[in-house]
C-alpha cells in the first residue's frame, strides 16, 4: 500500500500514527532507564494535540500539573492508604488546585497520573514520587516532540474539503427553507440551519489551527494567500446564513402568484448551481432573473410585507454571490500566474476526470 493512500485511510490518520509512535518511543525509553512505562504511556496518549502550537503551549502547563497530581497521590496514600476515600480526595484536590492555578489544560493528565499512582504507592514515598513524575514528564515531552517534529498537520486540503461541503450544505438548505416558505409549509426549518452554524464554527477552528502552526513553521506567501481566500469563502457562508435565517422566519400572508412562484424557484435553482460551482460563475440568465426579482420587489410598496422581505433577502444573497464570483475569479487568476500556489484550491478540483 502506498504511503499517500495509507495516510488517507478513513480510520487511521496522522494523529493516530503520532500517538502510536509517541507511545512506542516512550515505552522504549522507560524500559531503558528502568522506569514504569504505565504513567508515561498514559501521558503520551492523552497529550497528543492537533497542532504543534497546542502541544508546546499545553505541555508547559501539563508538566507542573502532573507533578501536583503525583504529590497529592503520594500524600493521600500515606495518610489514608488505598481506600475509596483516597481516590475521591486525590481526584477532587487535583481538579480543584489545577483550576485554582489555571492549569486547566493539565487537569486530565494530572488526575489520571494521581489516580493511577495510588495502587502502586509503597513505603518509599519520595522514590515513588520521583519515579512517577519522571515517567509522566517523559510521556508529555515525547508526545510534544513527536507532535512537533513528525507528520506536521496539513490543514489546507482538509479546510478546502470542508469549505466545499459547507457550500453544498448551504445551497441545499437555502433551497429547502425558501421552498417551504413559498409553499406555506409550517414544518420546523431551523434545525438544519443550526447544524450548519455548528459546522461553520468547527470549520473556522481549522483556520485558527493553521495560524497557530505558522508561529512555529515557515510557509509560503501563496499558502497564506490561499488560506485568506478560504477564510473569505467562509465569511460568505456566514453572511449567507444570516439571510437564510431571516428567510426561515418569514410567513407569507397569501400565496405567491404563479408567475412570482416560478420566478423565485427559478432563481433558487440558478443560485444553488452557482454556490456548488467551484468557480461560482454567474451566467447572463441569472442576472436576468435577479433583475426580475428586483422589479417584482419594487412593485411591492409596503417594505414590511412578507413577500417584499423574501424578495429583498434573495436579492441580498445575489449581491453576495456577485462578490464571491469576483473574489474567486481574482484568486483563480493569481493561482494560474503563481506556480507555488496550492493545487488543492483550484487545479485538483477543475481537472477533468479520466
From Swiss-Prot:
The keyword Membrane applies. The keyword Transmembrane applies. It comes from the Bacteria. One of its GO terms (cellular component) is plasma membrane. InterPro entries: ArAE_1. Its main location: membrane. The chain crosses the membrane at residues 22-42, 60-80, 107-127, 133-153. Coiled coil: none annotated. It is found in: Cell membrane. Keywords: Cell membrane, Membrane, Transmembrane, Transmembrane helix. It is a multi-pass membrane protein. Belongs to the UPF0421 family. This is UPF0421 protein BH2644. It comes from Halalkalibacterium halodurans (strain ATCC BAA-125 / DSM 18197 / FERM 7344 / JCM 9153 / C-125). The lineage of its organism: Bacteria, Bacillati, Bacillota, Bacilli, Bacillales.
